[in-house]
Amino acid sequence: MAATATKTIDFAAERALAKDFLANFAGPRGEPKYLNILQDVANRKIRAVQIELDDLFHYKDADDEFLQRVTENTKRYIGIFADAIDELMPESTEAYAVDEDRDILMTQRVDEGADGGADGTDPLQRMPPEIRRFFEVYIKAFSKVTPLTIRQVKASNIGQLVKISGIVTRCSDVKPLMQVAVYTCEECGFEIYQEVTARVFMPLFECPSQRCKLNKAKGNLILQLRASKFLKFQEVKLQELAEHVPKGHIPRSLTVHLRGELTRKVAPGDVVEMSGIFLPMPYYGFRAMRAGLVADTYLESMSITHFKKKYEEYELKGDEQEQIDRLAEDGDIYNKLARSLAPEIFGHEDVKKALLLLLVGAPHRKLTDGMKIRGDLHICLMGDPGVAKSQLLKHIINVAPRGVYTTGRGSSGVGLTAAVQKDPVTNEFVLEGGALVLADMGICAIDEFDKMEESDRTAIHEVMEQQTVSIAKAGITTSLNARTAVLAAANPAWGRYDMRRTPAENINLPPALLSRFDLLWLILDRADMETDLEMARHVVHVHQNLESPALGFTPLEPPVLRAYISAARRVVPSVPRELEEYIATAYSSIRQEEAKSNAPHSYTTIRTLLSILRISIALARLRFSETVAQSDVDEALRLMQMSKYSLYSDDRQRSGLDAISDIYSILRDEAARTNSMDVRYAHALNLISRKGYSEAQLKECLEEYASLNVWQIHPNTFDIHFIDA
């Protein structure tokens, strides 16, 4: 049996190849890409040098074998590229902030000839290259390679550069990791260096220098922490995405080590794509005795790519900015954006508008005395089964850059807020954020809200108004940020809405929680011949063609929606003084209507006034306007009325009023309230829209009562003048 020939690798030649690539690779404009990066490193502008395999692939002088060796033995080649960078590192061309301790120590070491100590032969006295370097080398995987799932990473990938996708479930604190330990001998005074390549190491106690050996002295070594080199270190748990888990299995997770500039780049709940080196991690101590030859594995991260950027991280490119400018000039953009949300779901136009405003939100306000007023909108969708509440929730989480979806029965109080757990690395008690904390600066969707235990539901009260989670457990007393918009879906108390009972009995939520929702949307499933026929056609079309029917325009894709919303969220509109009285009057009229009603449809408090302001500001943001217009306030009031539209229609049926008579009553009451004989058409349309009537019904009412000489209609503006108010 012939022995297989093994090819010896000349690492000096490999370093020459790496040096040639770094020195000669040109960017898209012909500029020396990596030499420019090294100049920024020398000027202390950046620390990370990221070498992309895509560039190595396109470099004319790099062969495929070299590329394969870099991919399969990445840890070794990081050192080779670092040595090549040491040789190519240019002198600094700009003044930079001096790191006093480090620079003084380095200057002193060079002046004293620390490179070699007493006779230059002792390896422990030679200054390691790591302690000289003020840069970090990362090798980024191919951009077009399909990422593996955690389940697909096998033992054959050990030592290789792999790309993995998953969701971050846990992040440890950032801690210092020793890279080079520096000791000083009490006898000879020399510096002794010890490179640390693992998580644990055995410190040196006796001086190994030649002078101490010649003097037969056992010099005592003192660890110099200020002179040693530390690296930022963070441990992260990456879990399989739900769509990658086979049937009947639980998601697997992988430990990821982040070092240096890659720390603090992810947070729990982020869906990311990581490229890194898959490495074994041997057990230590008693665990090693029991484990035998078995080792744990981890991923040493080289690059991190977020699937969905946060709104504030969006940097609009030229073509995206032009597209947003074109959309902003469209007079019907509000309707188009709303209809682009879940176009496969039939109808629910006003619900989609409310959900669009939830995504946009209003800016948080902080008063001079430190009090905060939230800007996030909270919406509860309550309705009969089968009206697509859960599908709307899932779609909003898909569109939002940061979103967490959970269900009422599957969530406990600590699962929503925060739990105290023991850190496996440090054995300390640490806080682990729940769904509401994970959704900080995003959206938390809670399905089956009515099925939650009352004790668990009360945990949400503080989050919805103060937007913090206060904890006092296991000796930890703190507050966590939970600046999240809550989107809840619930069924009425008896499964379906019972018209024989009052709204309060059907809704079955405590007033303390009810008042915290900006909009409580009641969606009732009523039999209607025309609507049911249209819906059935729509559902059959979606089922057959896997897409929504034509909407009259091309729906905007989620990335475009995110870009538009991120641009809108940068606007901070203000409410002009002339609208203050108008908003106050509208709020007081809502309170009066509720006081007159025997069974009020909602629970109106001063929070309702803040809700009107938040919705109005979100509408102004969509128009990229710096000030709130009256039309924004009118639309906010209309959405509040339309959320209870199905109940108003039943009230009208019970009272025996038809649409025409009810519209006449609304206009007559308005004329009496303002003590005026005239009502503008635009104002009349706004009034009846709030009650759920259409413009066609208003025109029919105007014509009918004009023929009875109750009022006169202006031929051009359609303004109303009462003949006898």
Swiss-Prot record:
Is Hydrolase among the key words of this record?
yes
- An example Pfam family from this entry, by short name, is MCM
Known EC number(s)? 3.6.4.12
| Entry keyword set | ATP-binding, Cell cycle, DNA replication, DNA-binding, Helicase, Hydrolase, Nucleotide-binding, Nucleus
Gene Ontology molecular function, alphabetical: ATP binding; ATP hydrolysis activity; single-stranded DNA binding; single-stranded DNA helicase activity
- SMART domains named in the record: MCM
Q: What residues bind ATP, as annotated? A: G383, D384, P385, G386, V387, A388, K389, S390
A GO BP entry is: pollen development
- Its top-level enzyme class, in one word, is hydrolase
Gene3D superfamilies attached to this UniProt entry = 2.20.28.10, mini-chromosome maintenance (MCM) complex, chain A, domain 1 (3.30.1640.10), Nucleic acid-binding proteins (2.40.50.140), P-loop containing nucleotide triphosphate hydrolases (3.40.50.300)
PROSITE patterns for this protein:
MCM_1 (PS00847), MCM_2 (PS50051)
Superkingdom, taxonomy of origin: Eukaryota
- Enumerate the spans annotated as MCM domain: 333-538
Would the keyword Cell membrane be found if you checked this record's keyword annotation? no
Q: Where is this motif: Arginine finger?
A: 515-518
**What reaction does this enzyme carry out catalytically?**
ATP + H2O = ADP + phosphate + H(+)
InterPro entries in the cross-refs: MCM, MCM7, MCM_CS, MCM_dom, MCM_lid, MCM_N, MCM_OB, NA-bd_OB-fold
Recorded GO CC terms: chromatin; cytoplasm; MCM complex; THO complex
- Compartmental location: Nucleus
Protein family membership: Belongs to the MCM family.
Role noted for this protein: Probable component of the MCM2-7 complex (MCM complex) that may function as a DNA helicase and which is essential to undergo a single round of replication initiation and elongation per cell cycle in eukaryotic cells.
Q: What's the subunit arrangement here? A: Component of the minichromosome maintenance (MCM) complex, a heterotetramer composed of MCM2, MCM3, MCM4, MCM5, MCM6 and MCM7.
The name under which this protein is listed is DNA replication licensing factor MCM7
**Organism name:** Oryza sativa subsp. indica (Rice)
